[in-house]
């Protein structure tokens, strides 16, 4: 089994964090993983994306030309990555911030008002976890429990107080896709 995903948005939206969480959780499950970040040329507020591959066998390359899935936080990322997802792939969209529908009928598309859900949980900064939960609710290359474990690696010190609300945000994303 090999699964790959591109995660894309603006810098500061938590794009890299959820990519690192997926990679770390995969490692904790004994899987082969790669995490490849990419940043736009801007110092602040620019685009950022990362590619994550989780596999049972060694991974030939971390580069994704036709990802199986994409999680997109903003319109710019949506416009860039929708055309390159493989046929039958998954596209998870924050419908709070993205004002158009996918143009491809050959994709499984999840429109989730992730920013709205995160705001209801107390802070729009949890949008990344809501989107990750929606992704894991549809395709589970790794378990939610492993992601919970990985949270404690990245949220340390004062940020450790945010672990429980991040778990709630993950679950809110899972619940959203499972209701449909």
Question: Which sequence ranges carry the predicted segments?
Answer:
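Active-site cofactor/cluster-binding pocket
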Residues: 1-180
């Amino acid at each position: 089994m090999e699964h790959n995903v591109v995660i894309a948005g603006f810098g500061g939206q938590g794009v890299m964090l959820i990519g690192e969480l997926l990679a770390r959780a995969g490692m904790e499950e004994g899987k082969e993983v790669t995490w490849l970040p990419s940043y736009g040329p801007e110092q602040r507020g620019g685009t950022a994306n990362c590619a994550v591959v989780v596999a049972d066998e060694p991974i030939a390359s971390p580069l994704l030309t036709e990802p199986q899935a994409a999680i997109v936080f903003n319109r710019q990322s949506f416009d860039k990555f929708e055309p390159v997802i493989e046929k039958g792939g998954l596209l998870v969209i924050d419908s709070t911030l993205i004002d158009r529908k996918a143009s491809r009928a050959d994709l499984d598309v999840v429109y989730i008002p992730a920013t709205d859900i995160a705001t209801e949980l107390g802070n729009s900064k949890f949008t990344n976890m809501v989107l990750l939960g929606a992704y894991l609710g549809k395709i589970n290359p790794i378990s939610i429990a492993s992601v919970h474990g990985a949270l404690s690696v990245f949220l340390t010190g004062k940020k450790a107080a945010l672990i429980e609300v991040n778990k709630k945000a993950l679950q809110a994303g899972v619940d959203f896709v499972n209701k449909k």
